[in-house]
Amino acid sequence: MWFSPTPSLFGENTVRHGGGGWVASLERTLGETPGIELGIAFELADSRFKAVENGVTYYPIDANIRRTQKIKRKLGLVSECDALLARAERVIDDFKPDLIHVFGSESCFGLLSERSDVPLMIHMQGSLPAYANARFPPGYSRFDFLRACGGNPLSLYRMISNDRAFLRRARGEENALRTCRHFMGRTEWDRAIAAIYSPTASYDYCAEALRPDFFDESRVWTPPGGERISLVSTLSNPLYKGADLILKTARLLRHEIGRELDWQVFGIDKARLQEAKTGVQAGDCGVAFKGVAEGTTIRDALLAADVYVHPSYIDNSPNSLCEAQVLGLPVVATNVGGVASLVRDGQDGFLVPANDPFMMAQRITQLKDDPERARGMGRSARELARDRHAPDRIRADLAAIYLKHAKDTA
């Protein structure tokens, strides 16, 4: 029984995001594995209790309760998880699973281990306590958000309530981590998080499933040539995703090193606060925020680029980076969280310190100016990533993990 942050392949509700779709990719990978009957529960406003599609039982959980209750949840007067967990218990009673697989320790569903006797495994994604520690880049604070609201009371309310909700969810995740007895992950960083909060719990390795758009054997990166440096990044909105580092690095590349630059940033369509704080306008140094895009659009942009750049201040195992590796693209990434478990520094790409635009700019320039080295790094990254994310391997690993822990039911 999966408890997912997205509807996965249910109906037409597959999440569209610059680097998303990983739950749907795993569902495709698992396919019709013998001996596995799959149920998937997720938050979605839908009148049906359950629906069966292609042999999978989907449970859309509609937790959008009365407006007064929603306001209380926003203000922190009632738990945002209570209504969701009550509905989740009903799903468990109906499906009667041998094992519960929760995607993400930050989910309310991780607290089901306190409400059910069914073995529960948390599939580590990010980790909000760690993200809370790094959520403001150097030089940023809550006051920057206050100023960005421009005196708009509604914007101010949303900012404050969202920040409080983030911190509440981080505390809730700590409770889920402490009570969980089984974890699954893929980096030394998420293994460490699990061990800190639940030192006696089991931990199993399973790589992340990637979108099939990136596994086309005929699509292999080669250095594009030319003088202009072409870069691609995929981000989301939080400040800790590093849009400010992109702007600072782009300024150095364009105005200090003197290189022509084309840096496509997918997943966000603006970074006004970061532009104001850094004093760097994206358009003045070749940065274009492209917004959310389809996987094929990002894939084609990667194949035409010189380097994939990942600038986060904290991360676990960004699928966007792995997708670039599968295509054979060299990467430059900040050495944070679980990234060092994905990139062998100097072999598949380069790792640089967080918030170091100088080293990032230099590594990008090195790869551009040495296409044979870039080609070798890309080839190494492709071999590593295609083995790591091979669907058959993931399917076998996941089935073995399920069999191992479902036996605990007795």
Task: List the predicted regions and their residue ranges.
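N-terminal subdomain of nucleotide-sugar transferases
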Residues: 1-47, 251
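Conserved donor-binding/catalytic core segment of Leloir-type glycosyltransferases
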Residues: 222-241, 247-251, 264
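Glycosyltransferase donor-sugar binding loop
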Residues: 234, 247, 259-275, 291
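Nucleotide-activated donor-binding/catalytic signature segment of Leloir-type glycosyltransferases, i.e.
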Residues: 274-299
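Aromatic "clamp/platform" in nucleotide-sugar-dependent glycosyltransferases that forms part
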Residues: 313
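Short hydrophobic beta-strand element within catalytic cores of glycosyltransferases
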Residues: 330-333
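Conserved acidic donor-binding segment of nucleotide-sugar-dependent glycosyltransferases
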Residues: 345-346, 350-357, 366-371
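A short, well-ordered alpha-helix in the C-terminal region of glycosyltransferases
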Residues: 359, 366, 373-387, 394-400
